A protein has these predicted regions:
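Solvent-exposed coil/turn segments that connect beta secondary-structure elements
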Residues: 99, 192-194, 238
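Protein-protein interaction and targeting regions used for scaffolding, dimerization, and localization
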Residues: 1-46
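Extended, non-catalytic scaffold segments that flank or surround catalytic motifs
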Residues: 3-6, 15, 34, 38, ...
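Extended, aromatic/histidine-rich regions of cofactor-dependent oxidoreductases associated
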Residues: 224-250
Length: 250
């Protein structure tokens, strides 16, 4: 992995002042761009109701980093509930700074806080930042590149934690039984849209008793399949003969 040269203190302080001025409109929160049945969870007509959501670039923060970035005693303020119960897009955003002062302003913070901070980007985002972010599943950040996070009250330099989030599907145990899969298995997602149908292999199953059936893909993947115009989505077991992706072990 190439060595990254981060901005010096003077450059970072200039970026802090820019963040405080709020010169760029806030980044939109992650949204769903296709749903099986009017956004309702549970089962419909005897089948699990599948929802496919595009996850825009975002970050997760520790309690300590929230206070550094937004001030002593600061807490994440929920702005919009996400589809999975207990998770939300916060009011707060940060600026993500990569090598050579390349930056992404107003990156949304998702809550609740975590034991480690992590930044999730699409491939085009990582190119824009000048960071060679690997494809990893959430939480698998060992050996990944870092970045600088800039908030209105301070900065945090991450030594690791910048990833391109691997596509995955959340489901509960009843959903998993329906599809004949278990936590950690790989599935296949077929998205049919006019002149732009795409099949995504290597979709990691993340099964939990309280989860709702929801696929997460990033903005590049959503644009590639023209998800806004999708006429049908099909979630199925990955066909025999397809090898597991290398990212499964990361």
């Amino acid at each position: 992995m190439t060595t990254q040269v981060m901005p010096d203190r003077q450059q970072i302080e200039a970026l802090v002042r820019q963040a405080i001025r709020g010169v760029v409109a806030p980044q939109s929160v992650p949204t769903a761009r296709f749903s099986g049945a009017a956004n309702t969870p549970g089962w419909v007509d005897g089948k699990p109701n599948l929802r496919v959501s595009i996850s825009a670039r975002h970050c997760h923060l520790t309690d300590e980093h929230v206070e550094i970035l937004f001030g002593p005693g600061a807490k994440l303020i929920p702005e919009k509930d996400l589809y999975q119960d207990g998770f939300y897009a916060a009011e707060q955003t940060v600026m993500v700074v990569g090598p050579r002062r390349r930056m992404l302003p107003n990156v949304r913070v998702l809550g609740p806080t975590r034991p480690f901070s992590q930044v999730e980007l699409a491939f085009t985002d990582s190119i824009s930042l000048g960071i060679d972010a690997p494809v990893r599943h959430s939480g698998k950040i060992d050996g990944t590149p870092g970045c600088v996070l800039v908030g209105p009250a301070g900065t945090v330099q991450l030594t690791q934690g910048v990833i391109r989030a691997a596509r995955h599907v959340h489901m509960n145990f009843a959903d998993a039984e329906h599809y004949g899969v278990a936590d950690g298995d790989m599935m296949q997602l077929v998205i049919r849209s006019p002149q732009c149908s795409v099949t995504f292999d290597e979709l990691l199953v993340r099964a939990d008793k309280a989860a709702k059936l929801e696929v997460h893909i990033d903005t590049d993947e959503g644009n590639a399949c023209n998800l806004d115009s999708a006429t049908e989505v099909l979630l199925q077991k990955q066909p025999a003969g397809h090898s597991d992706c290398a990212c499964k072990s990361h």
